[in-house]
Amino acid sequence: TYLLKKSYQHKTLKEINFKDLWGDKGVFTTMRILGKPTKILFFNSHIKNLIKSLKIYKLNRVGIKKDILKLIKLNVDNTKSYDHLLRVAVNNKMISVSLRERKTPKLEFNLKLINHKRIDPELKNLKYKLILKYLSKMDNTTSDVALCFKKKILESGTSNILFIKKNKIYSPSKNIYKGVTYIFFKKKIGKIINK
């Protein structure tokens, strides 16, 4: 369930009809927002990764970080209590901001294996239409997809996957997005073996 969906033109920041931008050339980040007063988990790291990806795709125009921060501030109500997911998506024409209800995963959770590797998987780009097609048919509190390529499990549709064997933790070495949560766990765990 969406609490908010808005899109804005670059530079002028004029509000326009909402587009989620899935499938476009562009990037996005999704951040957990919770509590009152509002806290966005790992906010600086998410924004840093977003700007880094914009630079790689040559979408990093002058002032874009300032505009993104302004739009987040505009759309987050500090008088509300949140437990939502805040998504910021950017292409060459607009910035889209949305807030949706966060669904808490249940302990009994399963993965549907699909033969798919994301385009430029090291980046959090908007080429997610096939993944979203599968996810839309699932109860996302109990199920996700696991992307497989050349007989290797890479990542889920929404998260990294870590494998545990004999008290050692493993992760694919390539064709995955090593996001903010992955980096957080790597620091906490101390060592993730890449294979």
Regions found by a protein language model. Give the residues of each.
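Dinucleotide-binding Rossmann-like beta1-alpha1 core, especially the glycine-rich loop
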Residues: 87
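Short N-terminal helix-loop-first-beta-strand/juxtamembrane motif that initiates sensory/input modules
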Residues: 82-84, 143-144
